[in-house]
């Protein structure tokens, strides 16, 4: 009787047994993955286009926004009887030779005055030219303006466009500090359908770009002085919870 002896393991390879997923597992993984993708696609725009106003006496609008946002800001101002409408914005970066206004704050304020049906206390708050972090620089300029008037208000509401809202609120809150609560109103971007943003190039560029920009602002952003001669010290980064 010949006894079979197992082949000894080789020098370079050896046999192993391993478990692999069955087709049922792959189907479940596919369904879960598709559900996750769908959740991101349908949920990212509502997440970014945050609307959460507070009871405030001061309304702020970003001066670079289009006419629909400006009209909505005027409607909000009249409906809730604010005392002041402030317009933020840095230098106009194109067509300066054809534009009578040096900054978006001044341009936006003039635009609002033309739109208003009666006299509204509109004040432009220009920001200096910067190479990066323009939204934050306009928020710092607003903080400096408040301090020159006396002290920042306890609450403000900020009006901006679509998915820019959550990032704007975060950066304005960082710049103004915890002494001022920042409410936010997001006005739909007329360039794309917010419920089907992925069907247009404008929607894809805007939503994906704003998501990446918000992720950077919420995790990596470190403020730097916006001008060498700033008389007001910049606040340290204190990112509020839930932004």
Predicted regions located by residue number:
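N-terminal intrinsically disordered, acidic low-complexity segments at the extreme N-terminus
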Residues: 1-10
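A structural signal for short, hydrophobic/glycine-enriched beta-strand patches
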Residues: 45-199
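Short, charged low-complexity intrinsically disordered segments located at boundaries
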Residues: 173-174, 201-205, 240-243
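A transmembrane-helix-recognition feature enriched in membrane-embedded lipid enzymes
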Residues: 200-227
């Amino acid at each position: 009787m010949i006894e079979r002896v197992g082949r000894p393991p080789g020098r370079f390879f050896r046999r192993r047994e391993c478990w692999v997923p069955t087709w049922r597992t792959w189907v479940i993984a596919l369904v879960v993955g598709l559900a996750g993708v769908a959740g991101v696609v349908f949920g990212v725009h509502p997440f970014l286009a945050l609307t959460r106003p507070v009871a405030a006496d001061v309304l702020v609008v970003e001066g670079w926004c289009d006419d629909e946002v400006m009209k909505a800001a005027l409607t909000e101002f009249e409906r809730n009887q604010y005392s002041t409408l402030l317009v933020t914005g840095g230098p106009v970066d194109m067509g300066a030779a054809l534009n009578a206004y040096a900054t978006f704050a001044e341009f936006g304020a003039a635009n609002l005055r033309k739109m208003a049906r009666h006299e509204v206390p509109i004040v432009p708050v220009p920001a200096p030219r910067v190479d990066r972090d323009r939204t934050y620089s306009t928020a710092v300029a607003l903080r400096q303006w408040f301090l020159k008037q006396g002290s920042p208000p306890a609450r403000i509401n900020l009006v901006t466009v679509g998915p820019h809202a959550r990032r704007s609120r975060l950066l304005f809150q960082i710049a103004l500090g915890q002494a001022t609560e920042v409410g936010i109103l997001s006005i739909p971007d007329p360039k794309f359908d917010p419920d089907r943003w992925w069907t247009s190039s404008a929607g894809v560029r805007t939503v994906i770009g704003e998501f990446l920009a918000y992720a950077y602002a919420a995790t990596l952003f470190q403020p730097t002085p916006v001008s060498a001669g700033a008389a007001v010290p910049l606040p340290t980064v204190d990112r509020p919870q839930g932004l």
